[in-house]
Amino acid sequence: MNVWLLKSHTPLGLLPYYSLLDPFCFMNQVDQVKQKLIDWLSSAKKLSEEVIVFTPEVKINLRDLAHNIHIIAHRVALGFKVIYLYLVDIIFPLLKNIQKSQKESSENLQSVLKIVKEQRRSLKQIEDQLSKVQSELAKLREDYLSRRPLSKQDVEELVVRISEQPKFIEKQTEALTEELKLKVEEVAKLIHSFKGMVLN
């Protein structure tokens, strides 16, 4: 795109239209444009700075009118120069710093996001490893409990159980003996009754 905002005899004419819309594109041309401004002002100083004052008695000719328009345009251009130099010396460097800061912030953000992603992956790996460790600990505990030597309390409880076994067996034997005795008595009664029936 090569569209010019004004003719080349004005300061802004040194800049393409798109450069004014995109200051970041323009900032690389600052020194070149400054030099062109200086050259333009040097040539403009040769012009007469006096504006011809028209009175009702004086007939206005096109040459004097063109001269006045030229001088006014020159003064307006000087005003644009002041604004332009303000942009060049203050605003554009500020925008450049902002652009640089934004770029650095973007790079830092990308680095932070990358670190966060790595940390999340590391945490996931740690969680998986922790789960495996807990499972292994549960298995080791179960195996230890099944193989561990008897403690003093375990031995005492086992002795009590063993000592109670003969008494339990004795009670069971007595109960069985009593039950057998009753059965024998019942059989004897049946035999006695059967004999009585046969003899009669």
Curated annotation (Swiss-Prot):
InterPro entries: CYMV_Orf1 (IPR010746). It comes from the Viruses. This is Uncharacterized 23 kDa protein. It comes from Commelina yellow mottle virus (CoYMV).
